[in-house]
Structures are given as C-alpha cells and as structure tokens.
C-alpha cells in the first residue's frame, strides 16, 4: 500500500515507522528539512520537504498513485486542507488528526463533507478508553459496538465470588440491566449457553 504521511512529529514518526514495518511504501512530508532528511535516511523511506497542503508538494510525494494520506501536523485546519487536496488530486483515502475541542461535536459532519475515511482525535479516544475502563473496572476486556450502545465484556469469575457456582439463567435474572451471556470459557473449552 502506498501511504503518504504529512507531519513528522511524534505521531507521524510513529505511524511511518510502524507502517513501514508492514511492507507499505511510505512517503513523509514535513517542512522541516533536517527532520525529513534524518528520518527518511534512518528508515529508508521517501521524504519530501514542503507544505503538505500544497498541491505541488503532494504531487512530488506521489499523491496520484497513493492509496492513503494521513495528515497529523500540529494544525487541525492544515490536516483537513491536506486531506481535501489529496482527495481532489489523487482520489485516495484520507485520515486527519483533529484535536480542537470545538470540532468534537462536528467530526461526523467534517468527515462526511470532506470525504474523509477517518477523523482521529487522540485525546478524545484516550478519554473514551479511560471512561470505558472505569465503567467496568473488574472487566478483563471491553469491546464496544453499535455506536457505543453495546458493550462486550470479559470477566473472570473468581472462586467463592457471588457469581461462582451460580447458574447462567440466575445471573441474568438477578442482575440489573439488559445482559446477555454469550460465552463461558473454562480452560481451553468454550461453551455457548442456550437461551
């Protein structure tokens, strides 16, 4: 996959490093010449020095053949502009990092109107993850589905706990909330209970 990353801060460098390990063809764009040269030579990737929102800079980076452009500069507006230009110049998928709190309620609108594949707000994602963990502190794992309306939880039932030796039908009837136990794991055995 040919991926262009605009912005070589910590996030951009980490993305470039991790994605290059997966045999992707990575090109980075940043206006800091030394940073681009050092990073590109260290990881054997293509580096372009310039403004990532410039059409000519994106063309030099190979936007016409790119599958994906990820904009992670320090400016939300620059990230969005980079993605808009990439979408028009190369018709590739685009991902923008948007951190400004004022935009958080407008992320879906921004994503749809600009044709972005994804909008990432790292701070909001971290806060959501912390809130999920705090919501179910004894859960081993929490996955959320259906726009946060469904939580899939994994618990370890400890010996002599309230749930130990309790029948599944009793668990669902005695707990508050809408609960469906979809699987029980005992060692290597997975049991799917009948309703």
Protein language model features and the residues they cover:
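Cytosolic regulatory regions of ion transport systems
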Residues: 1-195
């Amino acid at each position: 996959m040919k991926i262009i990353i605009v912005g070589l801060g910590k996030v951009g460098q980490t993305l470039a490093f991790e994605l290059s390990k997966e045999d992707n063809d990575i090109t980075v764009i940043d206006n800091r010449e030394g940073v681009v040269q050092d990073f590109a030579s260290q990881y054997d990737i293509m580096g372009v020095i310039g403004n990532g929102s410039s059409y000519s800079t994106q063309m030099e980076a190979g936007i016409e053949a790119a599958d994906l452009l990820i904009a992670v500069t320090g400016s939300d507006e620059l990230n969005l502009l980079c993605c808009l230009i990439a979408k028009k110049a190369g018709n590739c998928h685009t991902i923008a990092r948007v951190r400004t709190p004022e935009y958080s309620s407008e992320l879906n609108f921004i994503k749809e109107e600009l044709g972005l594949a994804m909008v990432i707000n790292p701070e909001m994602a971290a806060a959501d993850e912390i809130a999920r963990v705090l919501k179910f502190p004894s859960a081993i794992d929490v996955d959320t589905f259906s726009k946060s309306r469904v939580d899939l939880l994994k618990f370890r039932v400890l010996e002599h706990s309230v749930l130990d030796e309790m029948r599944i039908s009793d668990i669902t009837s005695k707990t508050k909330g809408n609960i469906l136990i979809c699987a029980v794991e005992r060692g290597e055995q997975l049991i799917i209970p009948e309703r």
